[in-house]
């Protein structure tokens, strides 16, 4: 099964907690604090793998979590950093942040990597908090929480040439004729429901990768049917072979088909519409006279400088000449580099610990937020040293000043989660 889009949840590892420990050795009565720092949590890293061709694996597993860092221990022993979690994705995968739709990375080359969530920093052990006036700190920091987010993976095929056209015009037959690809072929609409890749190997020509894109229908650029999913796969191609059914056996006009497909390409992306097109008038073996082809060719050439070939994928007529022109055109076009504008990029915000101050009906001032959770997790407010450190942090972070601005007075109660104290200026 070909899967070209997936949404997954990723969470990096939490940092390990710092240790509260005191040196206790024979003959060392005043050893002091010796708690070590916690280890860093594991990152989650996506890496492109040329051996993968689909995002099918992400249909079965959608949640990925890296390991937490190890906690610190006595004797200033640092906790071990967790190993990073590497997740393989196909080359050509675009990574987007799900909530914003912004691009995090475009993994177009072998072994391209991107860190999608960073592991949390390890907490500091109590040995770090010893000072001349605080010689036996009875608290340590917890590890920082890891990052988490949902990301979208979109696979855009890496092909030199894209075969485009309405359903049932013979694209799959052309691909099977010029390569070893074995796409499903039958005489009904939407036979191809997934892109197929093949390497065109024609004697005397440089090989190139060609993609059979499922048939585009009217309204594809607006998402009708599977239009947007199909169009995405030709964004990276350098040349388009526009396949037309010249026979008209299904009652469609070849010229009108040409105009309609180009309208869909233009609506989806002007750059895509402006890409070099070589026109392949297929199923010529079903046309008794050349007049139909010549009339079609004359109309198309009035629209622009198009190279037009009369071919039959069934009999092989004109195929080598068509591929020779494709090879010649490719030689003049550099490999497409995907440009990502800065405004389209997802740039993770620096993690900040915030708080807000509310006042309840009974007059109690409530301070809540991620800052409060982290602070209370890092100190033992039941110990004198911990309580003093707690107050210093509130003062340094501006919480005390903000409480005063909110109108707090001596004797008012302040609550941070489950911890309450009486305010004294």
Swiss-Prot record:
One of its GO terms (biological process) is ribosome biogenesis. The keyword Flavoprotein does not apply. Its EC number is 3.6.5.-. Residues 159-331 form the OBG-type G domain. One of its GO terms (cellular component) is cytoplasm. Mg(2+) binds at residues 172, 192. Residues 345-425 form the OCT domain. Pfam families: DUF1967, GTP1_OBG, MMR_HSR1. Residues 1-158 form the Obg domain. Keywords: Cytoplasm, GTP-binding, Hydrolase, Magnesium, Metal-binding, Nucleotide-binding. GO terms for molecular function: GTP binding; GTPase activity; magnesium ion binding. It comes from the Bacteria. InterPro entries: G_OBG (IPR031167), GTP-bd (IPR006073), GTP-bd_Obg/CgtA (IPR014100), GTP-bd_prot_GTP1/OBG_C_sf (IPR036346), GTP1-OBG_CS (IPR006074), GTP1_OBG_dom (IPR006169), GTP1_OBG_dom_sf (IPR036726), OBG_GTPase (IPR045086). It is an enzyme of class 3 (hydrolase). GTP binds at residues 165-172, 190-194, 212-215, 282-285, 312-314. It is found in: Cytoplasm. Its cofactor is Mg(2+). Monomer. An essential GTPase which binds GTP, GDP and possibly (p)ppGpp with moderate affinity, with high nucleotide exchange rates and a fairly low GTP hydrolysis rate. Plays a role in control of the cell cycle, stress response, ribosome biogenesis and in those bacteria that undergo differentiation, in morphogenesis control. Belongs to the TRAFAC class OBG-HflX-like GTPase superfamily. OBG GTPase family. PANTHER family: DEVELOPMENTALLY REGULATED GTP-BINDING PROTEIN-RELATED, MITOCHONDRIAL RIBOSOME-ASSOCIATED GTPASE 2. This is GTPase Obg. It comes from Clostridium tetani (strain Massachusetts / E88).
């Amino acid at each position: 099964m070909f899967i070209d889009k997936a949404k997954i949840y990723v969470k990096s590892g939490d940092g390990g907690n710092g240790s509260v420990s005191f040196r206790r050795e024979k003959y060392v009565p005043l050893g002091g604090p010796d708690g070590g720092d916690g280890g860093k949590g594991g990152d989650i890293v996506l890496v492109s793998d040329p051996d993968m061709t689909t995002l099918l694996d992400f249909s079965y597993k959608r949640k990925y979590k890296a390991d937490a860092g190890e906690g610190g221990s006595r004797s200033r022993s640092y906790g071990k950093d967790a190993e990073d979690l590497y997740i393989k994705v196909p080359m050509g995968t675009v990574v987007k942040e799900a909530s914003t739709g912004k691009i995090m990375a475009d993994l177009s080359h072998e072994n391209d990597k991107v860190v999608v969530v960073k592991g949390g920093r390890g907490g500091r052990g109590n040995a770090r908090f010893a000072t001349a006036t605080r010689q036996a700190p009875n608290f340590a920091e917890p590890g920082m929480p890891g990052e988490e987010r949902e990301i979208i993976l979109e696979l855009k095929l890496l092909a030199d040439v894209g075969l485009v056209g309405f359903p049932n015009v013979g694209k799959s037959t052309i691909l099977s004729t010029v390569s070893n690809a074995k796409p499903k072929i039958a005489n009904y609409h939407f036979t191809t429901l997934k892109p197929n890749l093949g390497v065109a190997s024609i004697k005397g020509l440089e090989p190139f990768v060609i993609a059979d894109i499922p048939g585009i229908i009217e309204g594809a650029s607006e998402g009708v049917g599977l239009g947007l999913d199909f169009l995405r796969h030709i964004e990276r191609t350098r040349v388009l072979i526009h396949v037309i059914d010249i026979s008209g056996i299904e009652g469609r006009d070849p010229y009108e088909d040409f105009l309609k497909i180009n309208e869909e390409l233009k609506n989806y992306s002007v750059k895509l519409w402006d890409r070099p097109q070589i026109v392949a008038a297929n199923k010529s073996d079903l046309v008794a006279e050349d007049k139909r082809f010549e009339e079609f060719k004359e109309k198309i050439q009035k629209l622009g400088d198009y190279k037009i070939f009369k071919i039959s994928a069934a009999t092989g007529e004109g195929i080598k000449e068509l591929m020779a022109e494709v090879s010649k055109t490719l030689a003049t076009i550099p490999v497409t580099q995907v440009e990502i504008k800065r405004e389209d990029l997802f740039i993770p915000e620096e993690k900040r610990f915030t708080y807000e101050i509310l006042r309840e009906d009974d007059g109690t001032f409530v301070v809540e937020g991620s800052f409060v959770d982290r602070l209370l997790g890092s100190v033992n407010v039941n110990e004198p040293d911990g309580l003093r450190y707690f107050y210093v942090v509130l003062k340094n972070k501006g919480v005390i000043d903000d409480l005063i601005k909110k109108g707090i007075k001596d004797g008012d109660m302040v609550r941070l989660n489950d911890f309450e104290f009486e305010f004294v200026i």
